[in-house]
Amino acid sequence: MYKLKKKVIYFLEGTGLLLIFIFLRILPLNTSSFLMGKLSSLIGPKLGVTKKAYNNIKNVMPEKNEKETLKIIKNMWENLGRVIGEYPHLKKLVPGKNNKIQICGIKNLLLVKKTKTPAIFFSAHFANWEILPMVSIKNGVPVLTIFRKPNNPIINFLIKYLRSDLPMAPKGREGAKKIIYSLRNGISIGLVIDQKMNDGIEVPFFNKPAMTSNALALLCHKIKSLVIPVEVERIKNTNFKVTFHNPVKVSKNGKKKTSLQIMTEVNLIIEKWIRKNPGQWLWLHRRW
């Protein structure tokens, strides 16, 4: 009975999302993004899950007053809605098309080709985090993106279809071999690493202990690779800026840094991005 109920729920959820995406795909990119952003900013702040975002902001940014906190929450929901509205139009966000994406630090991206060394690109749930692999591939740097496989098989199929042009590997054991194989064969990978990982290590984040995945550090210990931070910012509406920052130094005096040292530096970089544009980060994670 439980399995049947779960299948029915999955079917209703998946079919509902599919119909929404079909409708959004009919609309122009700008309209789809605006519509979902507006709806999300009106409905999202009233949902119970918003309490988690509110508590997170108060926990790590106590200097923000009530008005500023509520503005961050509203902006967060608008950005999340826009991401949903942009999902059916991902291929229209390819760099060079409609001049939607401004790229900075291109020399750091091209280091992969220059040094013939694969990169571990890391980013966060910022602006539209789906843009990174398209920017990289467009500039001749193949990248394998790591994703969390949805429990709902219909939603999983839909997401894989929308990302059909992008090489992907699921998180966990299933994708681990593919990730290592890719790096060893010169193919870069893309990680979104701002979520809590109970099987990770405790690393400071906003000066507070946070369980953090150390997969990035373990990979660069195992396989020679560049570790490149990629910051994605929503400049206005569906216009973005993607910045490839200087590689993180994973060695000191010829000796590899520890996982804790590397991940502390990574968390500091992400924290800097969040403080710069707090309304563009997804505060809904149970990060601390």
Segments the model singles out, each with a brief description of its role:
Residues P95-I101, R148, D165-K171, F205-N207, ...:
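Short, flexible loop segments at the rims of nucleotide/cofactor-binding pockets, characterized by
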Residues T115-R173, N198-I201, R234:
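Catalytic core of membrane glycerolipid acyltransferases/transacylases, capturing the structured
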Residues L19, T31, A53-N56, I154, ...:
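Hydrophobic alpha-helical segments typical of transmembrane helices
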Residues V49-K52, R148, N152-P153, A210-S213:
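Active-site metal-coordination segments of metallo-dependent hydrolases
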Residues M1-S123, Y161:
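Membrane-anchoring hydrophobic helices of lipid-metabolizing enzymes
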Residues K6, K71-K74, K113-K114, K138-N139, ...:
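Non-catalytic C-terminal accessory region of glycerolipid acyltransferases
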Residues L109-L110, P133-M134, N156-K160, I179-I180, ...:
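Short amphipathic alpha-helical segments and helix-helix/interface helices
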Residues T15, V49, I101, K171, ...:
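Soluble or luminal CAZymes and related metallo-dependent hydrolases
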